[in-house]
């Protein structure tokens, strides 16, 4: 008579299961720490870039606001004057770029929060949205001023607008410098938007 064989399955010890779970959690913590470190680095660069953009935008608005030149002709009673307030495009530039600079100052606390809490989504998302809106304002101001600067340098033969930069050299140099500074600020904003997009993508 054949004997029946009995097979007994012995499960893994609970200590092995707990050990595996501990290893998985540890790897998760290490990955999270590495991701947080990378995001903190992006946040620090974001903060420094905002400081630089503040300086550039304040400089652009100040240079445009103080752009003025007076040319005497024949007598001191007959003078020709050129100033930023003579052209609506330059007035818009000063107001718009001043708003951009104010926004950048107000955005610094949110940038600091992303340094302290690099994994936080809300402040980074807020910065991304408002950076996108403000760079549009900055771009429109720079484009409007750049068109007038071009006319000041080259004129327009079709409308008989003569270039004035040969006479008002200092004025044209100041407004051109302001437009270049505003264009640099646009590049800063593009980098800031890319930083925020990368930080959010890592989530």
UniProtKB/Swiss-Prot annotation:
Sites carrying sugar chains: 156, 174
Modified positions (N-acetylalanine) in chain numbering: 2
Listed A to Z, the keywords are: Acetylation, Cell membrane, Cell wall biogenesis/degradation, Glycoprotein, Membrane, Transmembrane, Transmembrane helix
**Which intervals lie on the Extracellular side per UniProt?**
62-92, 146-177
Task: Report the InterPro entries cross-referenced here.
Answer: CASP/CASPL (IPR006459), CASP_dom (IPR006702), CASPL (IPR044173)
Molecular function (GO) terms listed? protein homodimerization activity
Any one Gene Ontology cellular component term annotated for this protein: Casparian strip
Q: Which residues lie on this side of the membrane: Cytoplasmic?
A: 2-40, 114-124, 199-203
Q: Does the keyword Membrane apply?
A: yes
Specify the protein's topology with respect to the membrane.
Answer: Multi-pass membrane protein
**Chief subcellular location:** membrane
| Localization (cell) | Cell membrane
Biological-process GO terms, alphabetical: cell wall modification; cell-cell junction assembly
Q: Would you say which domain of life the source belongs to?
A: Eukaryota
Transmembrane regions: 41-61, 93-113, 125-145, 178-198
| Family of this protein | Belongs to the Casparian strip membrane proteins (CASP) family.
Function description:
Regulates membrane-cell wall junctions and localized cell wall deposition. Required for establishment of the Casparian strip membrane domain (CSD) and the subsequent formation of Casparian strips, a cell wall modification of the root endodermis that determines an apoplastic barrier between the intraorganismal apoplasm and the extraorganismal apoplasm and prevents lateral diffusion.
Q: Which NCBIfam families is this protein grouped with? A: A_tha_TIGR01569
Q: How does it assemble?
A: Homodimer and heterodimers.
Protein name from the UniProt record: Casparian strip membrane protein 1
Q: Which organism is it from?
A: Arabidopsis lyrata subsp. lyrata (Lyre-leaved rock-cress)
Lineage, please?
A: Eukaryota, Viridiplantae, Streptophyta, Embryophyta, Tracheophyta
